[in-house]
Regions:
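Short, low-complexity N-terminal intrinsically disordered segments enriched in polar/charged residues
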Residues: 1-32, 36, 44
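Short helix-to-loop capping/linker segments positioned immediately adjacent to catalytic or ligand/cofactor-binding
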Residues: 29-31, 75-78, 111
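A solvent-exposed, acidic/Ser-Thr-rich amphipathic alpha-helical stretch
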Residues: 39-104
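Short beta-strand edge/turn micro-motifs at domain boundaries
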Residues: 98, 117-150
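Short, cysteine-centered beta-strand-loop-beta hairpins and adjacent loop/turn segments enriched
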Residues: 106-113
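Extended, polar beta-sheet/loop recognition surfaces of beta-rich domains
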Residues: 149-161
Length: 161
């Protein structure tokens, strides 16, 4: 392998690492918006034709629906949410990327606190040099009232195998 070939190979590897970092930052930015209550900024993380599936909660298609759906989170009475992401795996192929991350969340509404576990499956696309979500699918493993436990009879939701 010549020096030029080695440099070109290193540049390709570096580009993939930089793309993965930008996709990871996109996911982090989403959860920063959620956790900080900046619901009006979430739409800027999506492509024009994006779709979002939030498990049994909601589906949004297109930026207008995504914007309205997430802004609605901020207007619900006594609604609080904090999300924590783990094990973000990312693949990149040119201007397309996919990612999976695991979710732990706490939310409360009308005085009841819930524990949530699930995962996000994402499809991302580079648009005008910026990585954006084109698809975000949340799969919830369970949502349960805090103190009940995730296998108790009072669970709010438990995904069957």
């Amino acid at each position: 392998m010549t020096d030029i070939n080695r440099i070109e190979a290193l540049e390709r590897r570096l580009a993939v690492l930089e793309d993965k970092d930008e996709i990871r930052r996109l996911r982090d930015d989403y959860h920063g918006c959620i956790n900080d209550g900046r619901f009006d900024e979430i739409v800027d993380l999506f492509t024009d034709d994006a779709h979002v599936e939030l498990g049994y909660l909601a589906t949004y298609v297109g930026r207008d629906a995504i914007d309205a759906g997430f802004r609605g989170m901020g207007t619900r009475e006594r609604f609080y949410i904090k999300q924590f992401i783990h094990s973000h795996r990312i693949n990149v192929d040119g201007d397309d990327g996919t990612g999976t991350s695991y979710l732990e969340a706490r939310y409360g509404r009308f005085g009841t606190s819930y524990l949530v576990s699930g995962k996000y499956d994402d499809i991302c696309r580079r648009v005008d040099g910026r990585w954006l979500f084109s698809s975000m699918i949340a799969v919830f493993y369970y949502t349960v009232p805090d103190g009940v436990g995730w296998t108790g009879d009072e669970l709010h939701y438990l995904k069957a195998k």
